[in-house]
Amino acid sequence: MVVTIISVFFAIVIGLGIGYYVRKSQDAHKVISAEQMATNILEQANNEAKSLKRAAEVDAKDLAQTYRNQVNDSYNDRQKHLQQQEQRLEDRINNLDKKDAALNQRDASLIQKENQVQTRLDDADKKEVLAQKLLTTQQDKLEEIAQLSPDEAKKQILSETKASLTRQRAALIKEAEEEATSEAEKRARNIIVQAIQRSSADSVADVTVSVVNLPSEDMKGRIIGREGRNIRTLESLTGIDLIIDDTPESVVLSGFDPVRREIAKMALDALVADGRINPSRIEEMVEKSRRQMDETIREKGEQAVFELGLRGMHPDLIKMIGRMNYRTSYGQNVLQHSIEVAKLAGMMAAELKMDVALAKRAGLIHDIGKAVDAEVEGSHVELGVRLAEKFNEKPIVINAIASHHGDVAAISPIAELVAAADAISAARPGARSESLENYVQRLKDLEAIANNNQEVHTAYAIQAGREVRVIVEPTKVTDLQAKVLAHDIKSDVEEKLEYPGHIKVTVIRETRAIDYAH
């Protein structure tokens, strides 16, 4: 019995232990499940929060972009509206200016008419006085006629009538001549004014320097070279003076010949861009620049011919036209002057129902002699006539060239128009400068004196005419003869030129030995 009770007791204890263990295991499992569920809920909440945040950011960006677009559209509309307002205001100002000009013109016309009316009133008063005198005279004559026979009275009346008609005829002829002259002058003035108003031209004075910009100050030393070899080579090959001073990152090219100066500028730009600067490279770039300059000159000529709508020009003549772009006359660019003359002559020819193309052609090449006047003897008129004859231009064009300075008589109205257009172009304010022309002419004369010697290969006036650099053939001139040549040129300069200060004469005799290794 006791054993049974003990067994039951142990069974109960064991059952309770097992139950406690099972219950504890279930509670632990529930805790783990709850923690897992909480973790899932937290992750889900975080994901939803991130999604909501991204959606909010997208909505905010869209809203900001929409607002930005609205602001831009509003700004553009306002800007467009302001531009329209400005345009309307400008149009209104222009209309007011036109109305003001019209009113001024009307006032001037009214004043002129008032003066004419006053003049006519004065004439009427004078005629009234004259008529009264004539009436008195006629009455006196009638009294005399009353004492004459019928035949004598008839003869006297016929004689007086004939004399009166003769005087009236002479007065009418004189009045017609004066009216025709006045109308012709007025018509000519109107034609010239219309041509000038339709032709726009720049008033730009040509200069004798060009500036080359450098990437750094160190480039100046490379341009000068060791012991100045590079700069001397460039100056000798181009005849242009290089001025290297304290001006930051720039070199000034000085020379009166625009072609030489442009060649030197092109060569120096190429050398600076390439970076290799030495005497042999300088010679190569100068030669390349000369070829490029020939092409540029041709393009300038073609552009001028195309601008004026001319055809049938000889290619060599077109190239000569391009060379005029690098010539100046009293500071005025010769090509621009010639184009302006061609346009003026063409417009006046159109007003007078003449050949417009022929007038433009004659105007364009009227100064063609200036393209070669530095190389060939003779005035630019003589050289221009020779060139026009060489390229088979029409006699009217040749005569326009020959007569535009009054050297020969004009044989056609076209020649007169060209001369008038030339005078208009040269006479407008700012077109020409006497001092620059005299300066350039002095430099040309200085070079001509040096080149007049047979031993001279070429000569360049540099340093604004304070130095002439003479290059001679080493096979023809010795060192001793070079000194004599410098003295002779110096004497010729002193005798033939007037100049301030002094002029340095430098004779360069250079010997080169060249061989090739194979």
Swiss-Prot record:
SMART domains: HDc, KH. It is found in: Cell membrane. Its EC number is 3.1.-.-. Coiled coil: none annotated. GO terms for cellular component: plasma membrane. Residues 334-427 form the HD domain. Endoribonuclease that initiates mRNA decay. NCBIfam families: HDIG, RNase_Y. This is Ribonuclease Y. The gene is rny.
